From Swiss-Prot:
The chain crosses the membrane at residues 13-35, 229-248. It is a multi-pass membrane protein. This is Uncharacterized protein AF_1654. InterPro entries: DUF5305 (IPR035185). It is found in: Cell membrane. Its main location: membrane. Keywords: Cell membrane, Membrane, Transmembrane, Transmembrane helix. GO terms for cellular component: plasma membrane. It holds the Pfam family DUF5305.
Amino acid sequence: MNNFKLIVRKWYIPVLIISLITLVASAYALYWATIPETKETQISIRHYSALAYFSGGAEVKKDNPIWANGSFVTLPVYSYSLTPEYSGEFYFTTAPRGDITIETEAKIVYFYEVSDAPVWEKVYYAASNTSRGEIKTNFKINVTDLKSKINEAQNSFGVYLGKTGARIDVSVHYYGKITGKDVDETLSFKIPIDVQSTYYSFSTLNETRDFEMPSTRVVEVQKPLHMKVIPAALCTVSIIFAGLSVVYRTKYSDVSSLEREIERVSWEKKLKEVSFARMPETNLEMVEVERFEDISKAAEETFEHLFYDREKGVFFFIHGGVLYYCREK
């Protein structure tokens, strides 16, 4: 530690300059590391939604104890005798509403299929319509007549392995601009019709289809942790070295005073390792050791105790009939 003090004190100016330069550089690196980077990423965002609805009902055409003749009813199932005609409406638009042209082609088909594989299919009714922004297509279907067409075709075919059915097919083509962006899409919708021997029913439709568009978003990305830890550590070390250099420069204005302090501490440490005694006047062989560290190590390795003669200023020990000594430096 004392040698460290001496080095820092002797090289006060270089240590201070290097510490300050390192401090500024590491502080800048730390500041730069705390600023997140930005990058562009491609994402998809909602552009608009296509909305399609179908619902309807039937007018009662016959006196009965349930509904008044001429009333309009909406039921899960309908009777051929009471409600032979079904009135339905298909509605289409977009959200948000766009500056678009909408074209619809609608047809009512009846068919026969085996294991979901079509055998034959016939068109009962077809219509087309054009509008802007939104569109409504109305249907008025004589389901009693439709049932007769199905039975007639099936009887003509003469095979009854599969099943018969009917549906409404609607193709919607729209083009133009929505929220200022060009669109051109064609969508298809199928509305099943359940035609049974004693009743029929229509499915409803309430469908939303979302459309997305690509967008660029700028996101923040944090820099790796080591890019913050290393500059922070360098900042800390630089501050410590700069502070120590100033403290040692202030405390030890004269380098010689620090050197004397180091020598004093070193001397006190040496004295703690030895015992005091007079070096004997003897005819033993004598070996002089140059450094205290060497004689201290030799005494330790030979398991001998090291002594110090204050009057002569000599460290010594005896081993194997030989007196080893080291003069005080």
